[in-house]
Amino acid sequence: AINAKKNNSNILVVSKTYPTHSQSVQAQGGINAVLYEDEDSVETHIEDTYKASCKLSNKENIKLMCQNAKDTIFWLDSIGVPFNRTSNKRIAQRKFGGTKKIRTCYSSDYTGLKILHTLYDKCIYENIEFKNEYFFLDLIIKDNTCVGAVFYDIVNGEVKEILAKTTIIATGG
């Protein structure tokens, strides 16, 4: 939503809960990223992640995620996520389960909560609209093109259509 807003688009985020009530607030550990190449490598990060998935995950997806992790952490830092810092002001990292190297970036023991609140605050700052307590039912398809979605308004008990030029489904997990 934040990146789409850069194009001066009208953005609407629809959620079955309030944005700050998701399971992300429970995530404590942190996010793995190779920030400093002299101490770690993306290749080792890829190997660790693939091994931790019992070699069941798509290795190309893991590669893409690990290659983009550094930029993602620095972007989160730039919008205000309060990552812990070392004495020389670098983003602090700690060792976490299943890793050979120290690469987990964290915000005390509230990493998910801090990231979620920072992203939500950024959305509010960017005037991104939210419709909460809307349960997704179906996509609206016309001539093989998605033109929106149908939702159940949990509060009012009504079915509502929301039309859109672009529909993005981000289900988490």
Where are these regions (language model features)?
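N-terminal Rossmann-like FAD-binding beta1-loop-alpha1 element of flavoenzymes
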Residues: A1-V13
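Short hydrophobic core segments
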Residues: E161-G172
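Conserved N-terminal/central alpha/beta ligand/cofactor-binding core
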Residues: S15-V147, F151-E158
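Hydrophobic/aromatic ligand-binding patch that stacks against planar heteroaromatic rings
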Residues: N3, Q23-S24, T167
